[in-house]
Regions:
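N-terminal accessory/precursor segments of enzymes
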Residues: 12-97, 133-220
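Single conserved hydrophobic/aromatic residue that forms the stacking wall/gate
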Residues: 1-14
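A conserved active-site cap/scaffold subdomain adjacent to cofactor or substrate pockets
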Residues: 231-233
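Long, well-ordered mid-to-C-terminal structural blocks that present hydrophobic/aromatic surfaces
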Residues: 236-331
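Active-site-proximal beta-strand/loop segments in catalytic clefts of secreted hydrolases
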Residues: 60-64, 124, 297-300
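A conserved hydrophobic secondary-structure block that centers on an alpha-helix together
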Residues: 84-86, 90-117
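Charged low-complexity "KEKE/polyampholyte" interaction tracts
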Residues: 301, 311-459
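Short beta-strand scaffold segments in enzyme catalytic cores
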Residues: 117-122, 127-130, 139, 276-281
C-alpha cells in the first residue's frame, strides 16, 4: 500500500486522503538504486502499468513531445510529475477512472509536467485517454466503446470540440497556448482545437504506418503517405456537430485478444526496444475480480508470448521475476571475453554470467541474439522464423492454460482459493515462457557458435 503522501525530494508533494492497494509491474530496485536512471533519488522505479483494488487501471505512458514553438510558451517543469510516477500516484489514490483523470489533470494544473505523454485511465465502466504535450496543457477524452486508434509517440487526438463537457476535460489554456505559439489549428470561437496539428508537429512514423496496415488489413501505408485523418480520434462530425469519439480506422473484423497480440508483434511496433507490453481486456459486466485480465509480455514482441493475469486476484509473481542480476557492460571496443553483441549503432554489450537467470534477462538475451547475433556470429532468417513459430505454439498453449485458469477460479468457492488459483496459474505460465525462452536461447547460442567454428575451419 502506497503512502498517500508522495515526494520526490524536489519540493513537490502529492497528498490525498485515501490510499489503495494495487498490482503493478515495476523495475527491480535492488540496493535502493533506480534501474531506470542508475541514481539514488527518491522517486519510485517506473511502475509501467497496473490495476488497484478498486478496479482502476492505468496503462504505461507513451512519451509525447510538443513542438519547440508551444514549449517556448509553456515549457516542461523540472519538478513536475514525470511518466515514471503517473501509475504510482493514480493507482494509489484513485477509486474510479474519473477520479484518476481529475487527479492527474489537477497535478498538471498545479505542479506541471516534466514531459509529455499519453496514458489510459480506465475502470469497468469508463475508459479515458489523456494527452499532454507541454508543461500545463492537457486534453482528456472519455472513449466510446468502438473507437480504434494508436499512439506511437504521436499525439492521437485530432479535431476536438471542448464543449462536449460530458466526455472532454481540457486545460483552460489549451487553445491560448497554441495561439501564442502561432501554431493553433481549429476554430477558437467554436471552442474546437486540432490537438495533433496544434501541438505535435511531425507525424511521420514507420510504426504508425505498420499499425495502419495491420488495422486496415492492407500494405499500402508508408510513413510518407498517411495523414492525420487516417489515424486521429475526434468528436466532431462532418456537419460540425459533437458526436461520440471516433477514428476513421475501420477494422475488417471484430478483434480478439490474439489479434491484439499480433498487432504488438508487427514490426517495427515489435522490436528490441520493447521493454514491457500490457494489454488490458475488460468486461463491462460481471464480477470485478474476473472482469479485468491483464496480458503482459517482456522485451521484443516480435518473438514473444503474452501471459494473462487477473490483477484483482494476483497475490504474488513467479520467482523468476524476482531474480536480481548483475549489470550488462557497455563498451566502444570489441570485448575479448564473455558473451556479447554489437547493436545497430556499433556499441558493444557484454552480459554478466547470471543474466539468463532472470525472466527479463533471458528474454533480452534471446531478442538480441535473434536481432544482432552473438560474439560477431549472426543467426539466419530460418532461425528467426523458427523462433516465431515456437512462440506462436507457446501462445496457443497459454490460451489453453488461460481457459483452465478461468475455470479453476470460477470453481473456487472462497476469495482466498480464487486468489490461489489465479496466482498459481499465471505464475506457472510465466515459468513456462521462461523455460521455453531459456531452452531456445541456449540451443541457438550453441548453433551459432558451431557455425562459426565450422566456418573458421573452412577458411
Amino acid at each position: 500500500i502506497r503512502d498517500p503522501e508522495m515526494s520526490r525530494g524536489l519540493g513537490d508533494v502529492y497528498k490525498r486522503q485515501d490510499s489503495y492497494r494495487y498490482t503493478a509491474r515495476r523495475d527491480d530496485n535492488g540496493l535502493g538504486v533506480c534501474p531506470d536512471c542508475d541514481s539514488t533519488h527518491e522517486h519510485t522505479p517506473y511502475e509501467e502499468a497496473g490495476t488497484n483494488e478498486k478496479g482502476v487501471m492505468v496503462s504505461a505512458t507513451e512519451s509525447l513531445y510538443g513542438t519547440d514553438a508551444v514549449l517556448s510558451v509553456d515549457p516542461y517543469v523540472d519538478n513536475g510529475i514525470e511518466e515514471a510516477e503517473i501509475t504510482t500516484v493514480l493507482l494509489s489514490e484513485a477509486s474510479t477512472a474519473r477520479e484518476g483523470v481529475a487527479l492527474l489533470t489537477s497535478i498538471y494544473d498545479n505542479a506541471g509536467a516534466a514531459g509529455g505523454s499519453g496514458v489510459f485511465i480506465a475502470d469497468q465502466n469508463e475508459t479515458w485517454f489523456v494527452e499532454n504535450l507541454t508543461g500545463h496543457t492537457y486534453l482528456a477524452l472519455k472513449l466510446s466503446s468502438s473507437v480504434v486508434f494508436m499512439q506511437p509517440n504521436i499525439a492521437a487526438m485530432g479535431k476536438i470540440d471542448l464543449d462536449d463537457t460530458d466526455n472532454v476535460v481540457a486545460s483552460a489554456n489549451l487553445i491560448s497556448v497554441a495561439q501564442k505559439a502561432g501554431t493553433f489549428v481549429g476554430d477558437a470561437a467554436a471552442n474546437v482545437i486540432d490537438l495533433d496539428a496544434s501541438y505535435n508537429g511531425d507525424i511521420a512514423s514507420d510504426r504508425m504506418a505498420a499499425g495502419l496496415n495491420y488495422l486496415y488489413g492492407t500494405d499500402t501505408f508508408t510513413k510518407d503517405n498517411y495523414s492525420e485523418t487516417d489515424f486521429a480520434i475526434s468528436n466532431v462530425g462532418e456537419n460540425g456537430a459533437i458526436v461520440p469519439v471516433y477514428s476513421n480506422i475501420q477494422l475488417t473484423k471484430k478483434f480478439s485478444v490474439e489479434d491484439s497480440i499480433h498487432f504488438f508483434q508487427t514490426e517495427p511496433i515489435g522490436k528490441t526496444g520493447n521493454v514491457e507490453t500490457h494489454l488490458f481486456q475488460v468486461s463491462a459486466t460481471g464480477d470485478l475480480n474476473t472482469a479485468i485480465t491483464e496480458w503482459t509480455a517482456f522485451d521484443d514482441d516480435v518473438y514473444n508470448a503474452f501471459v494473462p493475469y487477473y490483477p484483482m486476484l494476483t497475490t504474488d509473481t513467479a520467482d523468476v521475476y524476482k531474480v536480481s542480476v548483475h549489470k550488462v557492460t557497455r563498451s566502444d571496443e570489441q570485448p575479448t571475453e564473455g558473451v556479447w553483441y554489437q547493436d545497430a549503432k556499433g556499441r558493444y554489450y557484454t552480459y554478466p554470467d547470471d543474466w539468463t537467470d532472470s525472466f527479463y534477462g533471458v528474454r533480452d538475451a534471446l531478442s538480441n541474439l535473434l536481432t544482432y547475433g552473438s560474439n560477431g556470429n549472426q543467426v539466419t532468417a530460418k532461425d528467426r522464423a523458427a523462433a516465431k513459430a515456437s512462440y506462436a505454439a507457446l501462445q496457443q498453449e497459454i490460451m489453453a492454460d488461460y481457459a483452465d485458469m478461468k475455470a479453476a477460479v470460477a470453481a473456487a468457492d472462497t476469495l482466498e482459493s480464487k486468489q490461489a488459483a489465479a496466482t498459481n496459474a499465471s505464475n506457472a505460465m510465466s515459468q513456462k515462457v521462461y523455460n521455453t525462452t531459456l531452452k531456445m536461447y541456449n540451443k541457438l547460442q550453441a548453433k551459432t557458435a558451431a557455425r562459426a567454428w565450422v566456418s573458421s575451419l573452412l577458411h
